[in-house]
Amino acid sequence: PTPKLLQERGLAAVHEETVDPTIGYATAWFEEPSGLDDDWGVLATLPAIPNAPQMGCVIRFPTRRRLHCAVITYGKPRAPRSPDELVARLAELDVPQLHRLLQRAKPVSEVESYGNTQNRWRRYGSLPRFPDGLLVIGDAACSLNPRYGQGMTVAALSADRLDRELGSYLAQHRSLQGFGAHYQRSLEDVLKVPWQMALLEDSLWVSHFSGRAPSLTERLQQASSGRLLRAAFTDIDTYIRFMRVAHLLAPPTTLLTPRTLMRMLSQAPEPAGNDAPGIGPA
């Protein structure tokens, strides 16, 4: 691993930030049952702190007559090990439609599970020295909870930043000496927003499972993101803005329009003990 390599070369240890919401992630493929005429592409539920630590998602591939099902559970759960167990887990959700659908579907794969889901950011850009001839990119620099679907997008944005920085650096310096340190500092600007978005909800789950009461800032973030999500379900302009931010196509400031803010403020607060989920695509 790169941190060990750098220390072996006598360089400072890289600072690492880790936020682990302890989720289990399991997926499987199913054959679409006959008679499924509804016009939809994705069915999903979202978790809610503290009483609904589980989410389910079914993605439809109609041309192949396939359904891809995922179950994500916070709190170190035992992952489903068979399609039958995965379908049974869907029965625990408050929304019964997913379970009913998969009961009619035929499994066509084994269950694949994944447990290495923590958010981890290694801050190579803050090192006082960084060797030439080395770049750290993708999950090696920053890995994110896969629930939010940001990993490949962040890798693509990082590669785009590399392309632009490489051209401008060569034009200015006529050499790549010092470029590694320069790029790692520039990369931090790319990673900042997706990192903050992932932590909006994941930090609350960490607080919940540790028994620590969320801070005032965390509670305000949770309340505002919950109102935003409910507004996105009822207003098409808010929905489009929300999805562009969630998929890293636009900055979070895109949501700070008078119409969006008014839509958020008009949403009724969630009942106590059933807080809305934080920002993040299903």
Locate predicted features.
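Generic structural hydrophobic/aromatic packing signal, biased to beta-strands
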Residues: 28-30, 58-60, 69, 90, ...
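Short secondary-structure transition/capping segments
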Residues: 66-74, 142-153, 215-232, 282
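FAD/FMN-dependent oxidoreductases across multiple families
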Residues: 64, 77-190
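Alpha-helix boundary/capping residues
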Residues: 9, 93, 105, 246-249, ...
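Predominantly flavin-linked oxidoreductase catalytic cores and closely associated redox partners
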Residues: 1-94
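C-terminal helical "tail/cap" subdomain of flavin- and related membrane-associated enzymes
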Residues: 164-282
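A structural signal for well-ordered alpha-helical segments within the folded catalytic domains
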Residues: 3-4, 83-84, 157-160, 222, ...
